[in-house]
Amino acid sequence: GWLSYTYSKTQLRERDERGINAINGGKWYDASYDKPHDAKLVANYKFTHRVSISANADYSTGRPITVPVAKYEYGGGYRLYYSDRNSYRIPDYMRFDVALNIEPTHKNDAFTHFSFSIGVYNVTGRKNVYSVYFDTDAQGQIQGHQLCIFGAPIPYVNFNFKF
C-alpha cells in the first residue's frame, strides 16, 4: 500500500488598470479548483497468491464557492448580494472503498490471464457535495441547495482479461 499527501494553494487576482470593477477589488482570492489538502491511503493484503483485499481512503478539502450573504429589493423583485469571490467552501470530500480481488489463473507463462474483483465504492455512503446553488423562495428567503454525487454505497463487479 501507500500514503500520499499534498498541500497546495492556488489563488488568482484580477487587476483593472482603472482600479474599478476588478474581482474582489483586485485582492487575491482562491481559485475555483483550489484544494489545499489532498490525502490518499491505499492498502492491499494478499491472503494467498490468488486472493487479496484492497482498501482505498480519499480525503480532500472542499472547493471554494461564492455565496449570497444578503438580499435587496430591486425592480419589483429580490436580488442577491454575494460574498467576496470564493470566500466559502463546500464540505470536505471523503470516500472509503473496499474490494476482494481474485486471480484464478496465476501462471506467468500463460498466454491469457484473467482476474475479477468484487467491491464497494463509498462504503460509508457519505453524500459528498459536488455543487451548491442558491435561489430565493416565494417569501424572498435565500435557499441553499447541495448537489451530491454517489450519495450511497455502490457495489461493483470487475472482470479483467489480458492476452
Give the residues covered by each predicted segment.
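C-terminal beta-signal and adjacent terminal beta-strands/loops
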Residues: R50, Y59-G76, R95, I102-F163
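Generic detector of contiguous secondary-structure segments
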Residues: K40, K46-T48, G77-Y88, T105
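Gram-negative outer-membrane beta-barrel transporters
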Residues: G1-V67
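Flexible, solvent-exposed coil segments and beta strand-coil junctions
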Residues: R15-N24, Y74-Y82, T136-Q141
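Transmembrane beta-barrel architecture of outer-membrane proteins
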Residues: T6, D30, D34-K40, Y93-A99, ...
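Outer-membrane beta-barrel transmembrane domain signature
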Residues: Y82-D97, F163
